[in-house]
């Protein structure tokens, strides 16, 4: 690091000077113990002194002002850093602020003759603008200069502290001076390129720095010289000016103060017209909240520098600007001054309602947490646009935080101090939260180039122990500590007084002892323990993977919230922990593996409408939000590809998003409330669950079935864990070689079930005359299903059908026309639900029917039909009545005036009776017979077809063989 840059660290030097300068210690004692009774509220009109270090404001009487000036003068002479301002009161001295632009980096000479001429011209404007009092008066002019030229910019102040003027008079003087050709000529002779615009018009009212004070990380202006001008009203044309001798003998803080009235050299001179002005405009107390924030918050100073790296579009273009504001608001509510400062970088927008827009945006950020971007995004943007400058600022930020600890605690570093710096260095990469067991858990955001498992990139990885931090403390942190050593040695090489050199020697010795600790295992463990509290982000675990539209994939994060899906393979702030190892690639039907799978799907599900419906249904597995309450029951005798397809979906999604479920979950009795159910907990957070290979005639537990297919919250718990409540989000498929037995007549359950029966069988020697027999290919089960290329291709197919479902059916499976599955589901229901079979065969919708049936008449008709067609049994009328109320007849049942249920708008057929004009069977089938859904013949690009009841499918062709 360049030596001269060490002097930029005001905050470090402030800490150090408290240790070795008795004058600074005395000043702090005065402020905290004696002058605290004169503290004022921020914005108070009584304020006359502002301490930028602490942000405190004072209304000091003249006697206390003199005491403060005396302490400040002693600190100034010792070279102490100070940040005190005085508020220009209703009547105060005049300060002129000249901001010069030069053609060179050499400071202009500004010799006494030129400054004397400048004094004369300034006084002429004062005399012409104000009414000077009668008699002879001495008016003093002081010139303070900027210490150095910075990139062709320079400046100086003209202080006329004794002449007490009203703010309006000052403004008039400044306005007339701006157009003074003589002044412009004098400045031009000094090499100034902007003489017409270099005088700051706001210097009449802004708080003025007391002599010896400065802005943060700036050197104070230095006194060049002073002049004494004598004015006598009896001889106004004779105005002698001479240079002040032995000026350093005076208390310059006091003499150069614009508000002091008790100077030894400077005596106040009041203008009569200004004294007579009763209603003088108020001088505003400037808001120094940003300066105060940056003095006390190292991270705010750091962010201020980072924000300066962002290109203009970030404060000009509304979307980018709003993102910056949201990021600051979400990082800390205290960073409002940073947002205001950044917004003001575009004056045109700020002056046309910018403040109001910022106010609204800031409030929106505090209310709407879904747009959770933070300072991490600001860091990313800055690094993206200015990588080298970003690196320098980041390294400087670490150094500043550590240096403040070193100087504050005399070189001794403890666990928390190191942890604080580590947090500044790695706070964007690690997060800690407390899990359900009360343990602190570490998460690391995985970036390219570091060791990882497939799929962890661009996600938050759970760490048992943050090993990277352990290594970082010993290998990387030591370099920051080496810079502190350089900083201390730099001061040891300077011509300081003996007491200051002794301070730095002791500091270096203590710090060297602290440096060795970072290689000690037990010390590092202590640092990590302290870091847990700093890295803690409450409820972080609860926010992980809560966005159902975001899916962790092998090459990043896939967002399916928009169409088309978007792969996020760069920095982001989505809290994603789970993932599948599959890499997302956009759907490409020309990909050989995609062609292979499209052909396989065509073979496994020969009916085009059923194939599309099932693929639409399976595609919803990539979405983990609330879905339509459906479950697919897939019947097949074996060797028909259903198991391959279900397993492929599960393998593609991975264990985080999919789960194979134990069939006992559907067939066993429900556990009692206090018992654990690990099988049911497997559905928590999953987008897909499947059952397979059941025994013959398995009876499904209808209460569990309802719980699994109905939307809403469910409760369960793992072994030795607390009861949890979660939402059912899984797309579920149950496959079997035998039909399930579902002993319920509840229409609410049946309408959530879909049934499909496999027609195809894969054989070693298929019958060429049987279109339902296909040549088996063992590679699908033993080779292809494990191949990453096959898995990637199938994942792209799932995403393709998800996008198609959103675009063409608004994401609703029930809108997809599929007569094959509708008819097979109806047939399956009738085989299980005799009440439904009776309704679909014997009850017809008849709008013109005049007959109204009591519910008891419907019960009797069903009992007679059942005894004739099924089996003779004793029926319980009350149970049958309840079942009818929950059947498909529900919408036709009404209440009669005597509060009994009646069936209206329907007619019950007798045996062999036919339909009358205008009547139709209830249900999707026709008189109980299956719809004829033959195998669709070939059609090109079957995956592009959209099922539509008004447009029967065209003939299809097989996808080309890869």
UniProtKB/Swiss-Prot annotation:
InterPro entries: AEP_C962R, Helicase_SF3_DNA-vir, P-loop_NTPase, Phage/plasmid_primase_P4_C, PriCT_2, Viral_Helicase-Primase_Cplx. Keywords: ATP-binding, DNA replication, Helicase, Hydrolase, Late protein, Nucleotide-binding. Induction: Expressed in the late phase of the viral replicative cycle. Transmembrane segments: none annotated. Residues 607-775 form the SF3 helicase domain. GO terms for biological process: DNA replication. One of its GO terms (molecular function) is ATP binding. It comes from the Viruses. Its EC number is 3.6.4.-. The keyword ATP-binding applies. ATP binds at residues 636-643. The keyword Nucleotide-binding applies. Belongs to the asfivirus helicase C962R family. This is Putative primase C962R. The lineage of its organism: Viruses, Varidnaviria, Bamfordvirae, Nucleocytoviricota, Pokkesviricetes.
């Amino acid at each position: 690091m360049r030596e001269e840059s060490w002097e930029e660290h005001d905050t470090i030097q402030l800490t150090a000077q408290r240790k070795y300068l008795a004058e600074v210690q005395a000043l702090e004692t005065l402020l905290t113990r004696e002058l605290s009774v004169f503290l004022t509220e921020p914005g108070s009109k009584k304020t006359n002194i502002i301490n930028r270090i602490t942000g405190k404001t004072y209304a000091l009487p003249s006697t206390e002002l003199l005491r403060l000036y005396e302490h400040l003068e002693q600190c100034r002479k010792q070279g102490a850093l100070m940040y005190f301002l005085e508020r220009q009161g209703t009547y105060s001295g005049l300060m002129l602020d000249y901001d010069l632009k030069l053609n060179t980096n050499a400071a202009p000479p500004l010799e006494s003759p030129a400054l004397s001429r400048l004094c004369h011209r300034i006084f002429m404007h004062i005399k012409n603008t104000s009414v000077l009092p009668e008699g002879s008066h001495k008016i003093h002019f002081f010139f303070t200069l900027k210490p150095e030229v910075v990139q062709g910019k320079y400046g100086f102040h003209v202080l006329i502290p004794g002449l007490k003027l009203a703010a309006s008079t000052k403004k008039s003087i400044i306005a007339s001076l701006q157009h003074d050709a003589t002044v412009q000529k004098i400045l031009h002779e000094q090499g100034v390129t902007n003489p017409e615009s270099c005088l700051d018009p706001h210097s009449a009212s802004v708080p003025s720095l007391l002599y010896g004070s400065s802005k943060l990380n700036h050197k104070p202006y230095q006194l060049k010289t002073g002049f004494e001008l004598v004015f006598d009203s009896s001889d106004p044309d004779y105005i002698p000016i001479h240079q002040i001798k032995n000026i350093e003998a005076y208390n310059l803080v006091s003499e150069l103060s614009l508000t002091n009235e008790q100077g030894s050299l400077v005596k106040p001179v009041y203008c009569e017209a200004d004294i007579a002005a009763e209603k003088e405009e108020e001088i505003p107390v400037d808001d120094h909240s940003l300066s105060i924030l940056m003095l006390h918050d190292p991270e705010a100073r750091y962010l201020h520098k980072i924000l300066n790296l962002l290109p203009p579009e970030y404060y000009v273009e509304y979307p980018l600007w709003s993102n910056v504001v949201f990021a600051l608001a979400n990082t800390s509510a205290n960073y409002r001054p940073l947002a205001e400062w950044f917004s003001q970088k575009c004056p045109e927008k700020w002056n046309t309602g910018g403040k109001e827009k910022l106010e609204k945006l800031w409030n929106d950020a505090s209310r709407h947490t879904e747009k959770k971007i933070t300072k991490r995004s600001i860091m990313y943007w800055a690094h993206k646009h200015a990588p080298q400058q970003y690196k320098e600022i980041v390294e400087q930020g670490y150094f500043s935080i550590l240096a403040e600890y070193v100087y504050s605690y005399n070189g001794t570093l403890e666990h928390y101090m190191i942890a604080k710096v580590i947090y500044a260095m790695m706070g964007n990469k690690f997060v800690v939260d407390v899990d359900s067991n009360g343990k602190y858990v570490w998460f690391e955001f995985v970036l390219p180039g570091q060791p990882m498992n497939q799929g962890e990139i661009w996600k938050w990885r759970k760490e048992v122990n943050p090993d990277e931090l352990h290594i970082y403390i010993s290998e990387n942190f030591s370099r920051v500590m080496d810079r502190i050593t350089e900083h201390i040695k730099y001061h040891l090489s300077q011509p300081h007084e003996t007491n200051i050199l002794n301070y730095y020697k002791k500091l270096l010795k203590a710090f060297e002892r602290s440096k060795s600790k970072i290689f000690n295992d037990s010390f590092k463990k202590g640092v990590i323990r302290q870091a847990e509290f700093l890295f803690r982000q409450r409820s972080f675990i609860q926010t992980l993977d809560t966005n159902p539209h975001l899916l962790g994939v092998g090459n990043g994060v896939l967002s399916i919230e928009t169409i088309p899906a978007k792969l996020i393979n760069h920095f982001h702030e989505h809290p994603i922990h789970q993932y599948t190892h599959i890499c997302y690639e956009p759907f490409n039907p020309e990909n050989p593996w995609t062609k292979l799978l499209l052909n396989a799907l065509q073979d496994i599900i020969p009916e085009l409408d059923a194939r599309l419906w099932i693929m639409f249904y399976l595609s919803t597995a990539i979405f983990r939000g609330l879905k339509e309450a459906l479950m697919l029951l897939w019947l097949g005798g074996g060797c028909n590809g259903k198991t391959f397809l279900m397993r492929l979906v599960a393998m593609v999604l991975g264990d985080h998003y999919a789960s194979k479920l134990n069939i006992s979950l559907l067939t066993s009795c429900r556990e009692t409330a206090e018992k654990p159910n690990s099988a049911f907990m497997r559905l928590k957070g999953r987008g897909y669950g499947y059952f397979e290979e059941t025994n013959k005639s398995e009876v499904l537990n209808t209460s569990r079935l309802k719980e699994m297919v109905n939307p809403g919250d469910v409760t369960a718990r793992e072994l030795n864990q607390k009861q949890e409540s979660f939402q059912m989000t899984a797309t579920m498929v149950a496959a079997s070689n035998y039909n399930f037995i579902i002993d319920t007549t509840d229409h609410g359950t049946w309408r959530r079930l879909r049934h499909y029966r496999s027609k195809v069988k894969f054989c070693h020697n298929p019958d060429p005359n049987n279109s339902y027999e296909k040549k088996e290919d063992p590679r699908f089960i033993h080779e292809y299903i494990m191949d990453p290329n096959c898995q990637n291709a199938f994942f792209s197919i799932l995403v393709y059908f998800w996008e198609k479902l959103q675009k063409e059916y608004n994401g609703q499976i029930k809108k997809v026309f599929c007569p094959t599955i509708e008819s097979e589901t109806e047939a399956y229901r009738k085989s299980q639900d005799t009440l439904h079979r009776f309704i679909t065969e014997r009850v017809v919708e008849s709008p013109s029917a005049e007959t109204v049936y009591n519910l008891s008449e419907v019960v009797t008709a069903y009992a007679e039909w059942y005894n004739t067609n099924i089996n003779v049994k004793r029926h319980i009328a009350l149970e049958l009545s309840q079942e009818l109320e929950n059947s498909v007849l529900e919408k036709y049942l009404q209440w009669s005036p005597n509060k009994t249920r009646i069936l209206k708008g329907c007619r019950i057929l007798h045996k062999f009776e036919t339909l009358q004009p205008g009547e139709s069977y209830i249900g999707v089938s026709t008189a109980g017979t299956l719809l004829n859904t033959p195998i669709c013949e070939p059609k090109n690009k079957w995956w592009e077809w959209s099922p539509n009841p008004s447009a029967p499918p065209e003939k299809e062709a097989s996808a080309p063989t890869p």
